[in-house]
């Protein structure tokens, strides 16, 4: 057995967890995550978090502002790793919280929860640097295949990492997708994590990202009407003010990585939704006094450490 409370406490202190423990945590997490639907039904009150991208100090700031888990019910919209210095600590803490409080934290999959993307944008190299091998990267990227794709809040707000797909008119179509695999380059599963709203278009158009689609207000309105929903909530795009509201308040983007990549000088936000479905974007700046990363010797963190 592993003492999750002890591991969570150590993670809050930014300690690196042993490779053998991470392997065990990931095996436990698969059992929990595989029970979740492709569309997880959630209820208010709830706090929604956008991209984190390995900015661990800012994740701790989110828990300080929004309240600690499990006292606050959290929905994370994906993109936990890459670009920031502490992707390992970030995803390890979130997985531990999911294991400890499975009904109080929901983790969606973002486009960076992918083997291909993480080999390019930092997570893979961070694992090599901190552990001396790619085993931890493999454990976590295997877990990414189990993360759910979307959620609804009070059956009126549709939540996803990226956006909509021309292959999906009804939310029930998401339920039948085979999510337990690496993202394909195209198709509905890719669209959900890659697509973006675009006020300059009305329907679907090819995305400049090279994956997913851009979509306009007509598409958003049709999707909401067809599914008897009121709002779409997503992440995936940097917002200089921490959030953006589009299409006559039918769609919101929440971005939760302040001073993105430690140089963009943007604000961030979390979205707090109350039982009356009122929405409050709690805007915050980067956590103060962020440290330069210190990497422990690989031999030290790969030792057995079962508690």
Swiss-Prot record:
List cofactor names only.
Mn(2+)
The lineage's top-level taxon is Eukaryota
Q: Which GO terms describe its biological process?
A: asymmetric protein localization to old mitotic spindle pole body; negative regulation of septation initiation signaling
Residue numbers annotated as active site: 112
What residues does Mn(2+) 2 bind to? 79, 111, 161, 236
Pfam families noted in UniProt = Metallophos
What EC number(s) would the UniProt record show? 3.1.3.16
Reaction(s) catalysed by this chain's protein: O-phospho-L-seryl-[protein] + H2O = L-seryl-[protein] + phosphate; O-phospho-L-threonyl-[protein] + H2O = L-threonyl-[protein] + phosphate
Give the cofactor note.
Answer: Binds 2 manganese ions per subunit.
A GO cellular component annotation here is: FAR/SIN/STRIPAK complex
Example of a GO MF term: protein serine/threonine phosphatase activity
- What positions does the entry give for Mn(2+) 1 binding? 51, 53, 79
Does the UniProt entry include the keyword Hydrolase? Answer: yes
Which keywords does the record carry?
Answer: Hydrolase, Manganese, Metal-binding, Protein phosphatase
The UniProt entry's sequence similarity note says:
Belongs to the PPP phosphatase family. PP-X subfamily.
The protein's name: Putative serine/threonine-protein phosphatase C22H10.04
